[in-house]
């Protein structure tokens, strides 16, 4: 009970706190005199400077061990991701809705495509060489200027009807929209053994939806990524490299219904069956064209 | 303990759920991490609560025998009819009748009484029967003659009275409710844990709010800022510590139980360690609780007998003829007998039928002479007169075992002065000599000396009845005493005492050197109390009381300078007249105090007095009436063998062997657990910074999140649990029994130094080490450290599936997520590796690890092994389960933080070295925790 009587009043506590902040008898602030504070701060400054120095040293050593051209490990990029343009995300993944009769609903989509293809204009590709080979373009030496390697040209006109040059509306106006499919870059990745990787778009089977098979027109023809764009040697070796693209023009999309389109990349070393990653080797999107 | 700490955890859990609520409202696909975290926190609190309850219930079960009270009956006059009703049905105003032998059923004011005497010892400690009548004699109800009290006994006579108080309102009921009323005080360890919670909560909340403000200033969304705030607070809560502390305490409790200290209340384990005053009972605790022959006087010489527990080593000179006679008297003039069938039991442990002194004499002679029963058979007893309080002697006449000697032997023992009166000769060296004045003087000196030792002295004499007057056929009559009972031959004196337990003096010395004051509180006579106090060292050999000084200098007690005396013997009568201030002065000024003839209530007063000195008080007791003092004490210690159920119920700890030295073992364990808890907490707090930094860096510099909250839980509740328990097995660094008890307000469990050193030194080093592993993983996968800064928004975006790294490779959202988990695993492993170093450095606070020995505490290695195994299991075993956010980490990343771990060890060895080299220096003051 003796302990219970020691409850301090609020003012006492405040007084004690004030005394702690500044104790006039000993000249202590917050429990230390000024000189003590200087000493302890000096110690901490020194300690932290040394620790930061050591950490910086460790990072420096780490950076020295890193190869500038090829990452040490690529085990987490076994198979490339696939992306779609235009890319409009809804609650669950890509959702592209537009109304043919309302220009405003699809101009933003075509705008996305146009600005994406700006990187594939002949002017942007001026530093790249023309390739015609149907095999991998291996380069062991740094033959290009500035100790780099050559990259192959990919220009928007290779996408023909979906290049935006002949049809500025990319087919959106007539309900046969173009979608551009891009495969992610992975350093020194070889997608297949001999045949070039190919894009294949289908309607995703939905119950209670009897659909005629999807008809697609691919650009470049057959929807292939030519093998001479591979392997990719990294940003430092190929500063001007641009990903090859495939455009898919969907010809028979039913109007006023939401359909799910799945575009896979068919190649020996590209997998699309990872249950966790919806964008590995494939891209899936919902499409609803209204009239 | 459960209060403060689990509230912190509950707050954490609720915050998590709130965070999820907020996230869910803004984005219904929010991850369930916060829900898991909150649930786990809640489960942790509940589990540890159940665990602590189970631990205590286990101890409490032993108390199950309590509350079995025999229903008490009372004779009451109602409706002019005598009725017998249960005592609890009595009401105020009932007229009850009491007769000798009854227990008083309530507090009663007597209306009439015939020779009524009551035994008030359970209430006041007065062992003399008190007479009661109907007269009002004193203002104080305890003093007046016309009130009898509930639970006391009427010894003789009859009385009629009116009930004035029943149940809880009776005097003893008030004592009992006092006992339950004082039970709510917090134990010192609970106060320390609360203090620790304040520190942790303070750090968590202030860092959280600081970064909330920073986040808002950096134009983060307010909802995000709130989620950061919650994450920071949760990262700071040491989830596993509550369980660890409980386990550590129960481990110690188990260890103490092995050493005969049964701990009922887990927190009491530590309380004993901070004890600064022990108020010890005498009988049974300090002493063996059995009369034993201590001294003999014959041939004008005092001999010392062995009073140790086994009593076998009686090394005094037994060649004298006087001893032969004396031993015969001791063996023959004794009515006590061993219970049959105990031949295999050691003599001192055999059960005896007979009173305490006769038992002592029987065992004494059995040890020295061998089979006493056989001796008695050979010396056939003809007649005997048992001891009674008027005669004050005991006498028997025997045929002798010598077949040629037809004389009868008369043997007698009794109060020495009465025996001496009956003697005219004295035996010296086997020869009878006349008892002259000088011999009588020698007898008195010896008698006084033995009496002054607080011992009970008996005189022995014998007489061979002349064969002519008392032929073999003589018929002795004990009623008429037709034989001589004077002019006998005095043989010797023998004194007995309840001797101290042999381990006690050592234990008291240990207490002394440990800075614990031992106060004896006993109902016994002051002289006996003082003698025992001296022999066990409670009053040390060279210290004197005021009375001793007065006697030595031959001056009046009042003239003695009180400052000269180190010791004090205070009786209950003196204590009654003292004001609290005087008692405080007494307790403060005398290092050695004995309270004699004290009542149970006075025991409470003494305990309160000690607590006013800011002391942590341990009290030992066994009676019902001790229970308030036991409750009031910071730690009540009840006796396991002699203790009453009420005392055991009120106590926090039970000495299974009633032995004082067990308390000292308890103190040692208590101090050790305090030190080890300090180490455990330091160990646990350290990683909090390493767990907190990722969030801060994430908020300020926008790195991909280095470690997730679920992963944090696996450190707090996975890898760190066994190691922190292992620290409870650590041996003491130095002799912990050679330092003062900790001051309960100054020596905190978690002090500023501990927090600062753990957070700002080792914790920071750990954070840097863990970040190094994290950066290594990212850099080797393609993201250099510099590119990670301010990458957060792009990194966390689900809609960006071609994020470029430094090599121009493009990552999908899930690929990044997986890399992030690899980062979590790497950061986790970094912390784990450095926690091994942290565990090793925490083994000592001052000594070098090498002095303490790396391998003495095997459990530490079990802890380290468990850490590594759990981490390996998480990474390689569960790496494929994505919900746990672990991935299979490459082998070399496990070693990236090793240099940092070594650095931590080296730094801490340096700290300890400087502390040892420059004690009291600036370094010592700031770095020793």
From Swiss-Prot, chain A:
Q: Name one GO molecular function term.
A: ATPase activator activity
**Posttranslational modification:** N-glycosylation is necessary for assembly and functional expression of the pump at the plasma membrane.
Show the GO cellular component annotation of the record: apical plasma membrane; endoplasmic reticulum; plasma membrane; sodium:potassium-exchanging ATPase complex
Annotated membrane-spanning segments are: 37-57
Q: Where is the signal peptide?
A: none
Give, from the UniProt record, the effect of changing residue 222 to Q: Impairs targeting to the plasma membrane. Loss of pump ATPase activity
Q: Main site of residence? A: membrane
Arranged from A to Z, the UniProt key words for this protein are: Cell adhesion, Cell membrane, Disulfide bond, Glycoprotein, Hydrogen ion transport, Ion transport, Membrane, Potassium, Potassium transport, Signal-anchor, Transmembrane, Transmembrane helix, Transport
Q: In the UniProt annotation, what is the result of changing residue 99 to Q?
A: Impairs pump targeting to the plasma membrane. Loss of pump ATPase activity
Asked if the record carries the keyword Transmembrane, the reply is yes
Consequence when changing residue 21 to S: Has no effect on pump ATPase activity
Q: Quaternary arrangement and interactors, per the entry?
A: The ATPase pump is composed of two subunits: alpha (catalytic) and beta (regulatory). Interacts with alpha subunit ATP12A; this interaction is required for the formation of a functionally active pump and targeting at the plasma membrane. Interacts (via N-terminus) with alpha subunit ATP4A (via the P-domain).
The free-text domain remark for this protein reads:
The C-terminal lobe folds into an immunoglobulin-like domain and mediates cell adhesion properties.
- Can you name this protein? Potassium-transporting ATPase subunit beta
State the organism named in the record.
Oryctolagus cuniculus (Rabbit)
């Amino acid at each position: 009970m003796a302990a219970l009587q020691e409850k301090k009043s609020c003012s006492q506590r405040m007084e004690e706190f004030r005394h702690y902040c500044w104790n006039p008898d000993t000249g202590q602030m917050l429990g230390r005199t000024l000189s003590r504070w200087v000493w302890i701060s000096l110690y901490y400054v020194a300690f932290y400077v040394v620790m930061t120095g050591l950490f910086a040293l460790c990072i420096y050593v780490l950076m020295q061990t890193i190869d500038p051209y090829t990452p040490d490990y690529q085990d987490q990029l076994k198979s490339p991701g696939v992306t779609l343009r235009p890319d409009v995300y809804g609650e669950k993944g890509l959702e592209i809705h537009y109304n043919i009769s309302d220009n405003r609903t699809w101009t933003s989509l075509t705008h996305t495509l146009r600005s994406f293809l700006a990187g594939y204009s002949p002017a942007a590709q001026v530093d790249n060489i023309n390739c015609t080979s149907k095999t991998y373009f291996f380069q062991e030496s740094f033959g290009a200027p500035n100790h780099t390697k050559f990259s192959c040209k990919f220009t928007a006109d290779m996408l023909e009807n979906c290049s935006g040059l002949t049809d500025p509306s990319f087919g959106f106006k007539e309900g046969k929209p173009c979608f551009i499919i891009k495969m992610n870059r992975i350093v020194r990745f070889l997608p297949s053994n001999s045949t070039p990787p190919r894009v294949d778009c289908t309607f995703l089977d939905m119950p209670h939806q009897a659909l005629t098979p999807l008809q697609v027109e691919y650009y470049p023809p057959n929807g292939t990524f030519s093998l001479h764009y591979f392997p990719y040697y990294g940003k430092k070796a190929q500063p001007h490299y641009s990903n090859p693209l495939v455009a898919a023009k969907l010809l028979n999309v039913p109007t006023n219904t939401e359909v799910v389109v799945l575009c896979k990349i068919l190649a020996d070393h590209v997998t699309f069956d990872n249950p966790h990653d919806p964008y590995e080797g494939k891209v899936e999107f919902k499409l609803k064209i209204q009239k | 303990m459960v209060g403060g700490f689990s509230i912190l955890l509950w707050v954490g859990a609720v915050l998590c759920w709130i965070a999820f609520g907020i996230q869910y409202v803004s984005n219904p696909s929010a991850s369930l991490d916060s829900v898991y975290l909150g649930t786990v926190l809640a489960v942790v609190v509940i589990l540890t609560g159940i665990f602590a309850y189970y631990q205590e219930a286990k101890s409490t079960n032993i108390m199950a025998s309590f509350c079995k009270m025999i229903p008490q009956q009372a004779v009451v006059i109602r409706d002019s009819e005598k009725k017998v009703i249960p005592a609890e049905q009595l009401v105020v105003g009932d007229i009850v009748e009491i007769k000798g032998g009854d227990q008083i059923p309530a507090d009663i004011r007597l209306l009439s009484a015939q020779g009524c005497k009551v035994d008030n010892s359970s209430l006041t400690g007065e062992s003399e029967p008190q007479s009661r009548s109907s007269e009002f004699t004193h203002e104080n109800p305890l003093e007046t003659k016309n009130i009898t009290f509930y639970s006391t006994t009427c010894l003789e006579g009859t009385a009629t009275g009116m009930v004035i108080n029943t149940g809880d309102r009776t005097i003893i009921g008030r004592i009992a409710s006092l006992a339950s009323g004082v039970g709510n005080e917090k134990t010192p360890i609970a106060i320390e844990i609360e203090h620790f919670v304040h520190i942790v909560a303070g750090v968590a909340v202030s860092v959280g709010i600081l970064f909330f403000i920073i986040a808002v200033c950096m134009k983060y969304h307010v909802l995000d800022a709130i989620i950061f705030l919650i994450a920071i607070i949760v990262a700071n809560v040491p989830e596993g510590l509550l369980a660890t502390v409980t386990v550590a305490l129960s481990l110690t409790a188990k260890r103490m139980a092995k050493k005969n200290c049964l701990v009922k209340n887990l927190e009491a384990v530590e309380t004993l360690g901070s004890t600064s005053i022990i108020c010890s009972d005498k009988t049974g605790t300090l002493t063996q609780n059995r009369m034993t022959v201590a001294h003999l006087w014959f041939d004008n010489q005092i001999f010392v007998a062995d009073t140790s527990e086994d009593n076998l080593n009686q090394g005094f000179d037994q060649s004298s003829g006087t001893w032969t006679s004396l031993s015969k008297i001791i063996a023959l003039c004794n009515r006590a007998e061993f219970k049959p069938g105990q031949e295999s039991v050691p003599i001192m442990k055999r059960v005896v039928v007979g009173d305490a002194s006769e038992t002592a004499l029987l065992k004494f002679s059995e040890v020295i002479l061998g089979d006493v029963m056989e001796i008695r058979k050979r010396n056939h007893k003809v007649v005997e007169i048992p001891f009674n309080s008027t005669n004050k002697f005991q006498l028997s006449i025997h045929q002798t075992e010598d077949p040629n000697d037809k004389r009868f032997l008369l043997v007698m023992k009794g109060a020495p002065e009465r025996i001496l009166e009956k003697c005219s000769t004295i035996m010296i060296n086997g020869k009878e000599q006349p008892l002259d004045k000088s011999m009588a003087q020698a007898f008195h000196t010896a008698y006084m000396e033995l009496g002054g030792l607080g011992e009970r002295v008996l005189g022995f004499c014998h007489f061979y009845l002349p064969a002519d007057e008392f032929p073999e056929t003589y018929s002795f009559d004990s009623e008429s005493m037709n034989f001589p009972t004077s002019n006998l031959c005095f043989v010797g004196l023998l004194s007995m005492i309840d001797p101290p337990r042999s381990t006690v003096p050592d234990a008291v010395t240990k207490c002394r050197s440990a800075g614990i004051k031992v106060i004896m509180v006993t109902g016994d006579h002051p002289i006996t109390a003082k003698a025992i106090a001296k022999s066990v060292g409670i009053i040390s050999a060279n210290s004197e009381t005021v009375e001793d000084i007065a006697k030595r200098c031959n001056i009046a007690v009042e003239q003695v300078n009180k400052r000269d005396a180190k010791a004090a013997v205070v009786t209950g009568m003196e204590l009654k007249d003292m004001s609290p201030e005087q008692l405080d002065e007494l307790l403060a000024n005398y290092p050695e105090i004995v309270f004699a003839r004290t009542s149970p209530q006075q025991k409470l007063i003494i305990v309160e007095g000690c607590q006013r000195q800011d002391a942590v008080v341990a009290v030992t007791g066994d009676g019902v009436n001790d229970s308030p003092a036991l409750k009031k004490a910071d730690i009540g210690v009840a006796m396991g063998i002699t203790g009453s159920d009420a005392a055991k119920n009120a106590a926090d700890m039970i000495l299974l062997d009633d032995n004082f030295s067990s308390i000292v073992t308890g103190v040692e364990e208590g101090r050790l657990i305090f030190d080890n808890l300090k180490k455990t907490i330091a160990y646990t707090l350290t990683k909090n910074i390493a767990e907190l930094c990722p969030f801060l860096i994430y908020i300020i510099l926008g790195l991909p999140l280095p470690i997730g909250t679920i992963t944090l839980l696996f450190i707090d509740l996975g890898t760190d649990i066994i190691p922190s328990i292992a620290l409870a097995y650590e041996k003491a660094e130095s002799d912990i029994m050679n330092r003062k008890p900790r001051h309960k307000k100054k020596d905190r469990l978690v002090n500023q130094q501990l927090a600062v050193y753990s957070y700002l030194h080792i914790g920071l080093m750990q954070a840097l080490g863990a970040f190094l592993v994290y950066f290594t993983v990212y850099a080797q996968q393609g993201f250099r450290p510099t590119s990670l800064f301010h990458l957060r928004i792009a990194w966390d975006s689900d809609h960006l599936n071609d994020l470029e790294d430094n090599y121009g490779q493009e990552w999908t959202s899930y690929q990044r997520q997986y890399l992030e988990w690899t980062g979590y695993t790497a950061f986790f492993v970094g912390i784990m590796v450095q926690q091994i170093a942290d565990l090793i450095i925490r083994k000592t606070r001052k000594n070098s690890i090498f002095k303490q020995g790396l391998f003495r505490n095997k459990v530490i290695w079990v802890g380290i092994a468990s850490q590594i195994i759990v981490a390996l299991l998480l990474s390689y075993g569960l790496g494929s389960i994505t919900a746990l956010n672990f991935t299979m980490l490459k082998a070399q990343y496990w070693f990236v933080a090793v240099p940092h771990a070594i650095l931590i060890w080296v730094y801490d060895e340096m700290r300890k070295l400087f502390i040892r080299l420059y004690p009291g220096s600036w370094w010592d003051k700031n770095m020793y925790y």
